[in-house]
Design a protein with these regions (language model features):
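C-terminal alpha-helical interaction appendages
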Residues: 1-70
Length: 70
């Protein structure tokens, strides 16, 4: 059985974190999914999260949300 590559794992975890971050924004603000996605995808955290070398994607979505809110 093939092991997933580091890139595949990073992509999976990043996508999971992004979906959870959108949920958190909606729960906290009551905004639409489109607005929540805009807030997440346009946040400074987005660039940091996509940097595989920084490995921020291994942090929990709750922790990432706290970082995003700062």
């Amino acid at each position: 059985m093939n092991q997933p590559s580091h890139h595949q794992i990073a992509t999976y975890l990043t996508n999971y974190a992004l979906s959870e971050l959108v949920k958190y924004v909606i729960e906290d603000t009551g905004c639409s999914i489109e607005e929540a996605m805009g807030r997440v995808y346009n946040s400074p955290l987005m660039n940091a999260l996509q940097d595989e070398e920084g490995e921020l994607y291994v942090q929990s979505p709750a922790y990432l949300y706290e970082l995003m809110r700062q």
